[in-house]
Amino acid sequence: MASAAEQLASRFNFGALARAEELKKRIWFTLGALIIYRLGTYIPVPGVDPVELARLVQQNSTGILGWINGLAGGALGRMAIFALNIMPYISASIIIQLMTSVSPHLEQLKKEGEQGRKRINQYTRYGTVILAALQAYGISVGLEGQGNIVLDPGWFFRISTVITLTGGTVFLMWLGEQITARGIGNGISLIIFSGIVANLPLGLGALFELGRTGQLSTFTILGIVVGGLAVIAFIVFVERAQRRLLIQYPKRQTGNQVAQAEKSHLPLKLNTSGVIPPIFASSLLLLPITVANFSQGQGPDWLNYITALLGHGQPLFIALYVALIVFFAFFYTAIMFNPKDTAENLKKYGGFIPGIRPGERTAEYIDYVLTRVTAIGALYLAFVCVLPEFLTTFAGIPFYFGGTSLLIVVSVTMDTVAQIQGHLLAQQYEKLIKRTNLRGARR
Protein backbone atom coordinates (compact mmCIF):
# COMPACT_ATOMS: atom_id res chain seq x y z
CA MET A 1 0.00 0.00 0.00
CA ALA A 2 1.03 3.65 -0.12
CA SER A 3 1.80 3.56 3.58
CA ALA A 4 4.51 1.01 2.89
CA ALA A 5 6.22 3.44 0.52
CA GLU A 6 5.99 6.21 3.11
CA GLN A 7 7.41 3.89 5.74
CA LEU A 8 10.29 2.98 3.44
CA ALA A 9 11.11 6.63 2.82
CA SER A 10 10.86 7.56 6.51
CA ARG A 11 13.31 4.83 7.50
CA PHE A 12 15.93 5.81 4.94
CA ASN A 13 18.92 6.84 7.06
CA PHE A 14 21.36 9.07 5.17
CA GLY A 15 23.70 9.11 8.16
CA ALA A 16 23.99 5.32 8.04
CA LEU A 17 24.53 5.55 4.28
CA ALA A 18 27.52 7.85 4.80
CA ARG A 19 29.09 5.29 7.17
CA ALA A 20 28.43 2.25 4.96
CA GLU A 21 31.74 1.85 3.12
CA GLU A 22 30.80 -1.33 1.23
CA LEU A 23 27.51 0.18 0.11
CA LYS A 24 29.24 3.37 -1.05
CA LYS A 25 31.64 1.29 -3.16
CA ARG A 26 28.68 -0.46 -4.77
CA ILE A 27 26.96 2.86 -5.48
CA TRP A 28 30.11 4.37 -7.02
CA PHE A 29 30.58 1.26 -9.16
CA THR A 30 26.99 1.53 -10.38
CA LEU A 31 27.37 5.22 -11.22
CA GLY A 32 30.64 4.55 -13.06
CA ALA A 33 29.06 1.78 -15.13
CA LEU A 34 26.09 3.97 -16.04
CA ILE A 35 28.45 6.78 -17.08
CA ILE A 36 30.21 4.34 -19.43
CA TYR A 37 26.82 3.42 -20.87
CA ARG A 38 25.89 7.06 -21.42
CA LEU A 39 29.23 7.76 -23.14
CA GLY A 40 28.58 4.84 -25.49
CA THR A 41 25.29 6.39 -26.59
CA TYR A 42 27.31 9.19 -28.23
CA ILE A 43 29.71 6.98 -30.25
CA PRO A 44 28.17 6.79 -33.75
CA VAL A 45 28.05 3.84 -36.12
CA PRO A 46 30.27 4.57 -39.16
CA GLY A 47 28.70 5.34 -42.52
CA VAL A 48 25.67 7.38 -41.38
CA ASP A 49 25.00 11.06 -42.13
CA PRO A 50 24.14 12.60 -38.73
CA VAL A 51 22.30 15.60 -40.24
CA GLU A 52 19.96 13.48 -42.36
CA LEU A 53 19.45 11.03 -39.48
CA ALA A 54 18.52 13.87 -37.12
CA ARG A 55 15.96 15.07 -39.66
CA LEU A 56 14.41 11.59 -39.89
CA VAL A 57 14.22 11.25 -36.11
CA GLN A 58 12.65 14.70 -35.80
CA GLN A 59 9.96 13.77 -38.34
CA ASN A 60 9.12 10.57 -36.44
CA SER A 61 9.59 11.85 -32.88
CA THR A 62 6.01 11.02 -31.92
CA GLY A 63 5.89 7.62 -33.63
CA ILE A 64 7.40 4.19 -33.08
CA LEU A 65 10.90 5.50 -33.78
CA GLY A 66 10.54 8.17 -31.10
CA TRP A 67 9.28 5.62 -28.57
CA ILE A 68 12.24 3.29 -29.15
CA ASN A 69 14.65 6.23 -29.13
CA GLY A 70 13.29 7.30 -25.74
CA LEU A 71 13.94 3.87 -24.21
CA ALA A 72 17.46 3.87 -25.73
CA GLY A 73 18.33 7.22 -24.17
CA GLY A 74 18.61 8.94 -27.55
CA ALA A 75 21.16 6.41 -28.85
CA LEU A 76 18.96 5.38 -31.78
CA GLY A 77 18.49 8.99 -32.84
CA ARG A 78 22.27 9.36 -32.97
CA MET A 79 22.70 5.84 -34.46
CA ALA A 80 25.20 5.08 -31.70
CA ILE A 81 26.79 1.71 -30.94
CA PHE A 82 24.20 1.23 -28.17
CA ALA A 83 21.25 2.04 -30.46
CA LEU A 84 19.56 -1.31 -29.74
CA ASN A 85 20.04 -0.75 -26.03
CA ILE A 86 19.32 -3.83 -23.92
CA MET A 87 15.95 -4.56 -25.54
CA PRO A 88 17.11 -7.72 -27.42
CA TYR A 89 18.22 -9.19 -24.08
CA ILE A 90 14.84 -8.43 -22.50
CA SER A 91 12.99 -9.95 -25.45
CA ALA A 92 15.19 -13.07 -25.32
CA SER A 93 14.66 -13.38 -21.56
CA ILE A 94 10.90 -13.17 -21.95
CA ILE A 95 10.87 -15.70 -24.79
CA ILE A 96 12.97 -18.18 -22.76
CA GLN A 97 10.71 -17.75 -19.73
CA LEU A 98 7.61 -18.30 -21.84
CA MET A 99 9.17 -21.38 -23.44
CA THR A 100 9.93 -22.78 -19.98
CA SER A 101 6.22 -23.40 -19.48
CA VAL A 102 5.92 -25.48 -22.68
CA SER A 103 9.38 -27.09 -22.99
CA PRO A 104 10.06 -30.12 -20.73
CA HIS A 105 13.82 -29.61 -21.15
CA LEU A 106 13.74 -26.00 -19.92
CA GLU A 107 11.29 -26.95 -17.17
CA GLN A 108 13.75 -29.57 -15.94
CA LEU A 109 16.64 -27.09 -16.07
CA LYS A 110 14.61 -24.66 -13.98
CA LYS A 111 14.33 -27.29 -11.23
CA GLU A 112 18.07 -28.07 -11.18
CA GLY A 113 19.01 -25.04 -9.09
CA GLU A 114 22.12 -22.97 -9.77
CA GLN A 115 23.46 -25.16 -12.59
CA GLY A 116 20.13 -25.12 -14.38
CA ARG A 117 19.89 -21.36 -13.99
CA LYS A 118 23.33 -20.94 -15.59
CA ARG A 119 22.26 -23.06 -18.57
CA ILE A 120 19.08 -21.03 -19.01
CA ASN A 121 21.10 -17.79 -18.81
CA GLN A 122 23.40 -19.16 -21.52
CA TYR A 123 20.41 -19.85 -23.78
CA THR A 124 19.22 -16.30 -23.10
CA ARG A 125 22.59 -14.92 -24.22
CA TYR A 126 22.44 -16.92 -27.45
CA GLY A 127 18.93 -15.63 -28.08
CA THR A 128 20.11 -12.07 -27.40
CA VAL A 129 22.81 -12.30 -30.08
CA ILE A 130 20.35 -13.70 -32.64
CA LEU A 131 17.66 -11.08 -31.95
CA ALA A 132 20.20 -8.24 -31.87
CA ALA A 133 21.66 -9.33 -35.22
CA LEU A 134 18.21 -9.52 -36.82
CA GLN A 135 17.17 -6.12 -35.47
CA ALA A 136 20.49 -4.56 -36.48
CA TYR A 137 20.10 -5.88 -40.02
CA GLY A 138 16.54 -4.56 -40.16
CA ILE A 139 17.75 -1.11 -39.05
CA SER A 140 20.57 -1.07 -41.62
CA VAL A 141 18.21 -2.02 -44.46
CA GLY A 142 15.62 0.47 -43.24
CA LEU A 143 18.18 3.31 -43.17
CA GLU A 144 19.31 2.50 -46.70
CA GLY A 145 15.73 2.96 -47.86
CA GLN A 146 15.44 6.44 -46.28
CA GLY A 147 17.26 8.50 -48.91
CA ASN A 148 20.73 9.90 -48.25
CA ILE A 149 21.15 8.83 -44.63
CA VAL A 150 23.67 6.07 -45.46
CA LEU A 151 26.80 7.49 -47.11
CA ASP A 152 27.84 4.26 -48.85
CA PRO A 153 24.94 1.76 -49.03
CA GLY A 154 25.66 -1.90 -49.58
CA TRP A 155 26.59 -5.12 -47.90
CA PHE A 156 29.67 -3.66 -46.22
CA PHE A 157 27.51 -1.12 -44.39
CA ARG A 158 24.98 -3.77 -43.43
CA ILE A 159 27.57 -6.22 -42.09
CA SER A 160 29.50 -3.53 -40.19
CA THR A 161 26.26 -2.21 -38.68
CA VAL A 162 25.17 -5.69 -37.59
CA ILE A 163 28.55 -6.36 -35.96
CA THR A 164 28.68 -2.95 -34.26
CA LEU A 165 25.12 -2.90 -32.89
CA THR A 166 25.18 -6.56 -31.84
CA GLY A 167 28.51 -6.01 -30.08
CA GLY A 168 27.05 -2.98 -28.30
CA THR A 169 24.09 -5.00 -27.04
CA VAL A 170 26.34 -7.84 -25.84
CA PHE A 171 28.53 -5.31 -23.99
CA LEU A 172 25.46 -3.79 -22.31
CA MET A 173 24.30 -7.27 -21.33
CA TRP A 174 27.68 -7.90 -19.67
CA LEU A 175 27.66 -4.44 -18.07
CA GLY A 176 24.22 -5.06 -16.61
CA GLU A 177 25.36 -8.36 -15.11
CA GLN A 178 28.36 -6.59 -13.54
CA ILE A 179 26.12 -3.94 -11.98
CA THR A 180 23.87 -6.63 -10.52
CA ALA A 181 26.84 -8.55 -9.07
CA ARG A 182 29.11 -5.70 -7.92
CA GLY A 183 26.82 -2.68 -7.78
CA ILE A 184 23.41 -1.87 -6.38
CA GLY A 185 20.06 -2.74 -7.93
CA ASN A 186 19.23 -4.72 -11.05
CA GLY A 187 21.76 -3.81 -13.74
CA ILE A 188 19.53 -4.36 -16.76
CA SER A 189 16.71 -2.31 -15.25
CA LEU A 190 19.08 0.51 -14.27
CA ILE A 191 20.45 0.72 -17.83
CA ILE A 192 16.93 1.19 -19.20
CA PHE A 193 16.14 3.59 -16.34
CA SER A 194 19.18 5.78 -17.05
CA GLY A 195 18.36 5.88 -20.75
CA ILE A 196 14.81 7.09 -20.08
CA VAL A 197 15.80 9.63 -17.43
CA ALA A 198 18.65 11.01 -19.58
CA ASN A 199 16.13 12.49 -22.01
CA LEU A 200 13.97 13.99 -19.26
CA PRO A 201 15.59 17.48 -19.42
CA LEU A 202 15.04 17.58 -23.19
CA GLY A 203 11.41 16.61 -22.76
CA LEU A 204 10.79 19.23 -20.08
CA GLY A 205 12.64 21.82 -22.15
CA ALA A 206 10.46 21.07 -25.17
CA LEU A 207 7.33 21.32 -23.01
CA PHE A 208 8.27 24.72 -21.58
CA GLU A 209 9.32 25.92 -25.04
CA LEU A 210 5.78 25.21 -26.24
CA GLY A 211 4.56 27.35 -23.36
CA ARG A 212 7.00 30.16 -24.16
CA THR A 213 5.92 30.30 -27.79
CA GLY A 214 2.25 30.29 -26.83
CA GLN A 215 1.39 26.91 -28.34
CA LEU A 216 0.42 25.67 -24.87
CA SER A 217 -1.18 27.74 -22.14
CA THR A 218 0.22 27.94 -18.63
CA PHE A 219 -2.86 26.14 -17.35
CA THR A 220 -2.26 23.24 -19.79
CA ILE A 221 1.41 22.91 -18.78
CA LEU A 222 0.47 22.96 -15.10
CA GLY A 223 -2.17 20.30 -15.79
CA ILE A 224 0.38 18.08 -17.56
CA VAL A 225 2.84 18.35 -14.64
CA VAL A 226 0.18 17.69 -12.00
CA GLY A 227 -1.28 14.84 -14.06
CA GLY A 228 2.15 13.24 -14.43
CA LEU A 229 2.76 13.43 -10.68
CA ALA A 230 -0.69 11.95 -10.04
CA VAL A 231 0.04 9.01 -12.37
CA ILE A 232 3.38 8.42 -10.60
CA ALA A 233 1.64 8.41 -7.21
CA PHE A 234 -0.96 6.00 -8.58
CA ILE A 235 1.78 3.65 -9.86
CA VAL A 236 3.52 3.69 -6.46
CA PHE A 237 0.25 2.90 -4.70
CA VAL A 238 -0.65 -0.03 -6.97
CA GLU A 239 2.88 -1.47 -7.05
CA ARG A 240 2.81 -1.62 -3.24
CA ALA A 241 -0.73 -3.00 -3.06
CA GLN A 242 -1.23 -6.59 -1.93
CA ARG A 243 -4.10 -8.98 -1.33
CA ARG A 244 -3.16 -10.88 1.83
CA LEU A 245 -4.58 -14.33 2.50
CA LEU A 246 -4.67 -15.34 6.16
CA ILE A 247 -2.64 -18.50 6.86
CA GLN A 248 -2.94 -20.36 10.18
CA TYR A 249 -0.67 -23.02 11.66
CA PRO A 250 -2.00 -25.37 14.39
CA LYS A 251 -0.54 -25.78 17.87
CA ARG A 252 2.61 -27.89 18.02
CA GLN A 253 3.93 -29.89 20.94
CA THR A 254 7.67 -30.41 21.38
CA GLY A 255 8.34 -32.52 24.48
CA ASN A 256 6.54 -30.89 27.37
CA GLN A 257 6.24 -27.54 25.60
CA VAL A 258 3.21 -26.60 23.53
CA ALA A 259 3.72 -23.88 20.92
CA GLN A 260 0.78 -21.57 20.36
CA ALA A 261 -1.03 -21.49 17.04
CA GLU A 262 0.64 -19.10 14.60
CA LYS A 263 -0.81 -16.77 12.01
CA SER A 264 0.81 -15.38 8.89
CA HIS A 265 -0.20 -13.99 5.53
CA LEU A 266 0.28 -15.06 1.93
CA PRO A 267 0.79 -11.79 -0.02
CA LEU A 268 -0.51 -11.64 -3.59
CA LYS A 269 0.76 -8.54 -5.39
CA LEU A 270 -1.79 -6.63 -7.38
CA ASN A 271 0.69 -6.44 -10.26
CA THR A 272 2.59 -9.73 -10.10
CA SER A 273 3.81 -9.53 -13.70
CA GLY A 274 5.53 -6.14 -13.32
CA VAL A 275 6.46 -4.26 -16.51
CA ILE A 276 6.88 -7.45 -18.58
CA PRO A 277 3.43 -7.36 -20.31
CA PRO A 278 3.73 -3.86 -21.85
CA ILE A 279 7.34 -4.48 -22.92
CA PHE A 280 6.54 -7.77 -24.63
CA ALA A 281 3.34 -6.36 -26.16
CA SER A 282 5.35 -3.50 -27.64
CA SER A 283 7.91 -5.94 -29.03
CA LEU A 284 5.20 -7.93 -30.82
CA LEU A 285 3.64 -4.81 -32.29
CA LEU A 286 7.05 -3.73 -33.60
CA LEU A 287 7.41 -7.00 -35.55
CA PRO A 288 5.50 -5.88 -38.71
CA ILE A 289 7.61 -2.71 -38.88
CA THR A 290 10.82 -4.74 -38.60
CA VAL A 291 9.66 -7.06 -41.39
CA ALA A 292 8.71 -4.04 -43.51
CA ASN A 293 12.23 -2.67 -43.08
CA PHE A 294 13.65 -5.92 -44.46
CA SER A 295 11.61 -5.41 -47.63
CA GLN A 296 12.66 -1.72 -47.92
CA GLY A 297 9.01 -0.74 -48.43
CA GLN A 298 8.73 -2.97 -51.51
CA GLY A 299 6.88 -5.78 -49.71
CA PRO A 300 3.32 -6.94 -50.35
CA ASP A 301 0.52 -4.39 -50.08
CA TRP A 302 -1.09 -6.17 -47.14
CA LEU A 303 2.13 -5.84 -45.11
CA ASN A 304 2.39 -2.12 -45.81
CA TYR A 305 -1.31 -1.74 -44.97
CA ILE A 306 -0.91 -3.52 -41.62
CA THR A 307 2.21 -1.48 -40.84
CA ALA A 308 0.25 1.73 -41.45
CA LEU A 309 -2.62 0.57 -39.21
CA LEU A 310 -0.17 -0.30 -36.43
CA GLY A 311 1.39 3.13 -36.41
CA HIS A 312 1.93 4.66 -32.99
CA GLY A 313 -1.33 6.21 -31.78
CA GLN A 314 -3.58 4.51 -34.32
CA PRO A 315 -6.85 3.04 -32.92
CA LEU A 316 -5.90 -0.51 -33.96
CA PHE A 317 -2.50 -0.11 -32.30
CA ILE A 318 -4.11 1.00 -29.03
CA ALA A 319 -6.71 -1.80 -29.11
CA LEU A 320 -4.14 -4.53 -29.79
CA TYR A 321 -1.78 -3.00 -27.23
CA VAL A 322 -4.44 -3.27 -24.51
CA ALA A 323 -5.39 -6.82 -25.53
CA LEU A 324 -1.76 -8.01 -25.53
CA ILE A 325 -1.04 -6.36 -22.18
CA VAL A 326 -4.00 -8.12 -20.57
CA PHE A 327 -3.06 -11.46 -22.16
CA PHE A 328 0.59 -11.33 -21.07
CA ALA A 329 -0.37 -10.14 -17.58
CA PHE A 330 -2.33 -13.37 -17.04
CA PHE A 331 0.19 -15.54 -18.90
CA TYR A 332 3.24 -14.24 -17.06
CA THR A 333 1.49 -14.37 -13.68
CA ALA A 334 0.73 -18.05 -14.31
CA ILE A 335 4.45 -18.62 -14.89
CA MET A 336 5.58 -16.63 -11.85
CA PHE A 337 3.06 -18.03 -9.34
CA ASN A 338 1.78 -21.61 -9.17
CA PRO A 339 -1.23 -22.03 -6.82
CA LYS A 340 -0.84 -25.85 -6.73
CA ASP A 341 2.78 -25.66 -5.54
CA THR A 342 1.84 -23.05 -2.95
CA ALA A 343 -1.04 -25.19 -1.65
CA GLU A 344 1.19 -28.27 -1.43
CA ASN A 345 3.85 -26.36 0.52
CA LEU A 346 1.24 -25.04 2.94
CA LYS A 347 -0.13 -28.55 3.48
CA LYS A 348 3.38 -29.93 3.94
CA TYR A 349 4.15 -27.52 6.79
CA GLY A 350 0.70 -27.71 8.36
CA GLY A 351 -0.58 -24.34 7.19
CA PHE A 352 -4.14 -23.77 6.03
CA ILE A 353 -6.53 -21.00 5.03
CA PRO A 354 -9.41 -20.77 7.55
CA GLY A 355 -12.57 -22.30 6.12
CA ILE A 356 -10.74 -23.90 3.17
CA ARG A 357 -9.77 -27.58 3.09
CA PRO A 358 -5.99 -28.09 2.60
CA GLY A 359 -4.77 -29.44 -0.72
CA GLU A 360 -6.77 -29.13 -3.94
CA ARG A 361 -9.46 -26.87 -2.46
CA THR A 362 -6.77 -24.47 -1.22
CA ALA A 363 -5.16 -24.40 -4.68
CA GLU A 364 -8.53 -23.63 -6.27
CA TYR A 365 -9.19 -20.83 -3.78
CA ILE A 366 -5.75 -19.26 -4.29
CA ASP A 367 -6.23 -19.47 -8.06
CA TYR A 368 -9.69 -17.87 -7.68
CA VAL A 369 -8.28 -14.92 -5.73
CA LEU A 370 -5.17 -14.62 -7.92
CA THR A 371 -7.28 -14.46 -11.10
CA ARG A 372 -9.29 -11.53 -9.79
CA VAL A 373 -6.23 -9.74 -8.46
CA THR A 374 -4.48 -10.22 -11.81
CA ALA A 375 -7.51 -8.84 -13.65
CA ILE A 376 -7.23 -5.62 -11.64
CA GLY A 377 -3.47 -5.51 -12.24
CA ALA A 378 -3.91 -6.04 -15.99
CA LEU A 379 -6.44 -3.21 -16.22
CA TYR A 380 -4.07 -0.99 -14.24
CA LEU A 381 -1.20 -1.73 -16.66
CA ALA A 382 -3.39 -1.10 -19.69
CA PHE A 383 -4.68 2.17 -18.23
CA VAL A 384 -1.23 3.55 -17.39
CA CYS A 385 0.26 2.53 -20.76
CA VAL A 386 -2.61 3.74 -22.94
CA LEU A 387 -3.45 7.00 -21.13
CA PRO A 388 -0.50 9.00 -22.59
CA GLU A 389 -1.20 7.50 -26.03
CA PHE A 390 -4.86 8.49 -25.83
CA LEU A 391 -4.18 12.04 -24.63
CA THR A 392 -1.47 12.61 -27.24
CA THR A 393 -3.44 11.19 -30.18
CA PHE A 394 -6.99 12.33 -29.49
CA ALA A 395 -6.58 15.34 -27.17
CA GLY A 396 -3.39 16.75 -28.68
CA ILE A 397 -1.69 16.98 -25.27
CA PRO A 398 2.06 16.25 -25.55
CA PHE A 399 3.50 13.70 -23.13
CA TYR A 400 7.23 13.11 -22.96
CA PHE A 401 6.94 9.91 -20.90
CA GLY A 402 5.01 6.96 -22.27
CA GLY A 403 3.18 4.71 -19.85
CA THR A 404 5.79 1.96 -20.15
CA SER A 405 8.56 4.46 -19.42
CA LEU A 406 6.75 5.70 -16.33
CA LEU A 407 6.28 2.15 -15.06
CA ILE A 408 9.96 1.36 -15.57
CA VAL A 409 11.20 4.55 -13.90
CA VAL A 410 8.95 4.24 -10.84
CA SER A 411 9.46 0.48 -10.40
CA VAL A 412 13.26 0.66 -10.74
CA THR A 413 13.45 3.59 -8.32
CA MET A 414 11.40 1.75 -5.71
CA ASP A 415 13.39 -1.49 -6.10
CA THR A 416 16.76 0.30 -5.91
CA VAL A 417 15.80 2.28 -2.81
CA ALA A 418 14.54 -0.95 -1.21
CA GLN A 419 17.88 -2.68 -1.96
CA ILE A 420 19.85 0.22 -0.47
CA GLN A 421 17.63 0.06 2.61
CA GLY A 422 18.27 -3.69 2.81
CA HIS A 423 22.04 -3.16 2.74
CA LEU A 424 21.78 -0.55 5.50
CA LEU A 425 19.68 -2.87 7.68
CA ALA A 426 22.14 -5.72 7.13
CA GLN A 427 25.00 -3.45 8.20
CA GLN A 428 23.12 -2.39 11.34
CA TYR A 429 22.46 -6.04 12.24
CA GLU A 430 26.15 -6.87 11.77
CA LYS A 431 27.16 -4.05 14.12
CA LEU A 432 24.57 -5.18 16.67
CA ILE A 433 25.88 -8.76 16.57
CA LYS A 434 29.48 -7.55 17.00
CA ARG A 435 28.52 -5.43 20.01
CA THR A 436 26.66 -8.36 21.56
CA ASN A 437 29.68 -10.63 21.06
CA LEU A 438 32.02 -8.04 22.60
CA ARG A 439 29.80 -7.65 25.66
CA GLY A 440 29.65 -11.42 26.05
CA ALA A 441 33.45 -11.67 25.83
CA ARG A 442 33.94 -9.00 28.51
CA ARG A 443 31.73 -10.92 30.91
Show where each model-derived region lies.
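N-terminal cationic and glycine-rich segments that engage phosphates or anionic surfaces
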Residues: 2-110, 115-443
